[in-house]
Each structure stands twice: as structure tokens, then as C-alpha cells.
């Protein structure tokens, strides 16, 4: 089980809502992957209408909604969006995203830390999307973030765990859950993240743009389960040298 703030999740796979061909396909994929925490961009929903094409099926599915501030370029914009989300959806949970450059969508570390500290003080449960910077992740933890969400690679790039070395440090030193977010392109990437110690992964593009999103969602569910089970099973240590599994020395000597 995964514990974040005041909630417990059986699934270690979180999903997004962008890029799906239809709301129906989105919900089917979410159900197939078993995700219990789903992000949605505030700029994509009509907060005045709970029968919004994206919002209504998510509410009906019974998942925990994690509104995000995607599109915000400054701490002030993110804080404003956070308050709109809390008022409209009745949740203190927030995925904090601040990326000023639309080409690379890389998170702004200075604005993210600034916004996170303010939002925590205002009663939000903040899960910040951030670069794979161990120092920044520790600072975000220290100001009260409920989890940290370092990137594996740029959003939507499907490149996998390009920041693996830094992710390992973040995981080793964290005392809050670590959710690898962005860049995960295939199920094996998700399995690797769980194997190395991440508490969860957030996947959107890789599922939504697949030829068969529902089956891809199932594949990610199985990969996350496999990665977690592998870690819990205690994998053997790596070695630079070979270690025979079936020594033949005694047999050969006896036959000589």
C-alpha cells in the first residue's frame, strides 16, 4: 500500500487525462490500469460544470482527483490556479507544475519551491513536479510537500529514465514518497522505476497515444506490479565478475 498525506492507495500507478481520443477511452484506460489517483489540468476543464466531458466521468469512476497547475509560468499563477481548483473541486490535493518554456516543459525550480512553500502554508497537499535534482527535492520535502515528483525525461518524450543516477539519490534520501513523473514511454520504464525504489510512477502520454490505450494501460499495470514485487523480493547484487551457477570442477576431476 502507498501512503501519501491522508490517503492510502493500493495502486502504485498514477495516470493523467490528456491526449486521449475521447473521454470514454480515457475512463476505460484508467480502469484497465487500476489507477486510483488521476491528474487533470485545470485549463482543460470547465470548473463551473461538474458534467464537464472530462470531469464528470472521473467523478463517476470514483478516483482521487489531483488537479494540476499545468500552464502556469510563475509561482503567482500556480497559486491562483490552486485556489480555483480547491474552490471548484473541494480538494486540497494539488500537483504543482510550473514550466515557463513551452518547448521543453521543464519545471522552474525557483518558482516551484516558492509556490510550494506558500501553498503548504495555505493548507494544500502539494505534490510538485520537479527536475531530478536531489537538493531541490530535499528542499521541497523540508517545506512540507507530501511527495516529490521528479522527472525521468521531458514531458511526453517517451525517453524513459534518462535521469536515473539522480533519481537513485533522490529515492535514497527521501522521507516522503517519490513519484517518477514524465518521460516514461513503455511499461519496462515503469518497472525499472519501481525496481530502483520509486514509490509510484505517473504515466499519461505513453498510454493515451498508444494504438490500443486500454491494453497499454493493462501492460503498465502489470509492469508496475512486477517492478514492485521484484524490489520487495530482494534482487541479487550486481557484480563485475561471473559467478557460476552450476560449478563443474568436482565432476570433471572425479571423471579424470
Curated annotation (Swiss-Prot):
- Reactions it catalyzes: [ThiS sulfur-carrier protein]-C-terminal-Gly-aminoethanethioate + 2-iminoacetate + 1-deoxy-D-xylulose 5-phosphate = [ThiS sulfur-carrier protein]-C-terminal Gly-Gly + 2-[(2R,5Z)-2-carboxy-4-methylthiazol-5(2H)-ylidene]ethyl phosphate + 2 H2O + H(+)
State the family named in the UniProt similarity comment for this chain.
Answer: Belongs to the ThiG family.
What class does this enzyme belong to in the EC scheme? transferase
Query: Which BP terms does GO give this entry?
Result: thiamine diphosphate biosynthetic process
- Does the keyword field hold Transferase? yes
Task: State the organism of origin.
Answer: Escherichia coli O81 (strain ED1a)
Q: What is this protein called?
A: Thiazole synthase
The pathway it acts in is: Cofactor biosynthesis; thiamine diphosphate biosynthesis
Its GO CC terms? cytoplasm
Amino acid at each position: 500500500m502507498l501512503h501519501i498525506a491522508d490517503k492510502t492507495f493500493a495502486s502504485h500507478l498514477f495516470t493523467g487525462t490528456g491526449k486521449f481520443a475521447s473521454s470514454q477511452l480515457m475512463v476505460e484506460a484508467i480502469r484497465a490500469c487500476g489507477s486510483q489517483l488521476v491528474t487533470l489540468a485545470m485549463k482543460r476543464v470547465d470548473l463551473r460544470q461538474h458534467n464537464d466531458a472530462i470531469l464528470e466521468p472521473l467523478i463517476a469512476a470514483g478516483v482521487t482527483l489531483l488537479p494540476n497547475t499545468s500552464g502556469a509560468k510563475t509561482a503567482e499563477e500556480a497559486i491562483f490556479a490552486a485556489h480555483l481548483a480547491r474552490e471548484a473541486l473541494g480538494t486540497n490535493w494539488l500537483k504543482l507544475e510550473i514550466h515557463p518554456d513551452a518547448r521543453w516543459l521543464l519545471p522552474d525550480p525557483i518558482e516551484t519551491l516558492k509556490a510550494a512553500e506558500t501553498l503548504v502554508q495555505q493548507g494544500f497537499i502539494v505534490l510538485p513536479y520537479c527536475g531530478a535534482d536531489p537538493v531541490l527535492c530535499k528542499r521541497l520535502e523540508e517545506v512540507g510537500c507530501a511527495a516529490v515528483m521528479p522527472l525521468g525525461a521531458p514531458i511526453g518524450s517517451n525517453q524513459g529514465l534518462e535521469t536515473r543516477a539522480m533519481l537513485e539519490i533522490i529515492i535514497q534520501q527521501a522521507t516522503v514518497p517519490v513519484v517518477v513523473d514524465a518521460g516514461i514511454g513503455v511499461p519496462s520504464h515503469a518497472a525499472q522505476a519501481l525496481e530502483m525504489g520509486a514509490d509510484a510512477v505517473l504515466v499519461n502520454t505513453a498510454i493515451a497515444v498508444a494504438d490500443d490505450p486500454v491494453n497499454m494501460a493493462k501492460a503498465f499495470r502489470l509492469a508496475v506490479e512486477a517492478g514492485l514485487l521484484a524490489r520487495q523480493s530482494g534482487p541479487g547484487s550486481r557484480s563485475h565478475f561471473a559467478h557460476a551457477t552450476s560449478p563443474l570442477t568436482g565432476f570433471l576431476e572425479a571423471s579424470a
